[in-house]
Amino acid sequence: HTSLSTVDILDDKVVDRFIAETHEKYNEYFGGKIGEYIKGFFTDEPQYFGTATPYPHLIEKYFRKNYGVNILDQLGLLYCEKQGYREFRYKYYYVCQQLFLHNYSEKLYNWCSEHGVKLTGHYIEEMGITQQMYYCAGIMPFYEYEHIPGIDWLCRRFLTVIPAKQLVSAGAQLGKDEMLTETFALTGWDVTPTELKAIAEFQFLYGINIMCMHLLPYSELGHRKNDYPVHFSSSNAWADDVLPKFNGYFDRLGALMRGSEEDVKAAVL
């Protein structure tokens, strides 16, 4: 495993240490009663590697225990289309997903559940099935381990409906009624409230019902103003005037949707 930006979060011992240095420290600060003071944690873009081949520390042990083989004997099948390569690649990415799912996502979810806080956030590259393989090998199983499952929606584009429909489908199957989007990043400083309203309504049309709006920074000094704007700070000329009505509209729309049940007429298998 080699990465410049992340540790091996598929390793349960690494995740245990992460929780000890973050969640447990916050809980200690609040006298062991963190759930009385904060609502939850937001996990942002966890992934097993990125646009390269993941090789978590535990994968060799998993292959020996569950498949009875030495993964090193077949590793070349990731790059060569020889006999058995399809089966091996399926197993390889399935194992990566299972290690990620249970050693990171489930651990965080269980800790939050035990301490009275909610886990929300989003993973990465939910926009298509192929992109998901690079980062998590399929996004839908991960939504089980978020109290408020979420997606990321970048730019001004009206993108594919795949991320919203996968999220809402998983939520319906799991009995979750809150579906979150982190949205409006990369829309730019010149984006208008009308454009943002259209972007949000498109997502709400497909079942999203809570927005985590990007971004309200502590400061706009230096390069901070270039952090994937738009920002809803005092540097935004219309934010103070428009946001109360804007947020009120989507608060009411979201509440209506969370109190409703979608009448689904078709299943896509």
Where would I find each of the regions flagged by the language model?
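Catalytic and substrate-binding clefts that recognize carbohydrates or anionic sugar/phosphate headgroups
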Residues: 1-32
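Carbohydrate-binding surfaces of carbohydrate-active enzymes
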Residues: 28-40, 45-269
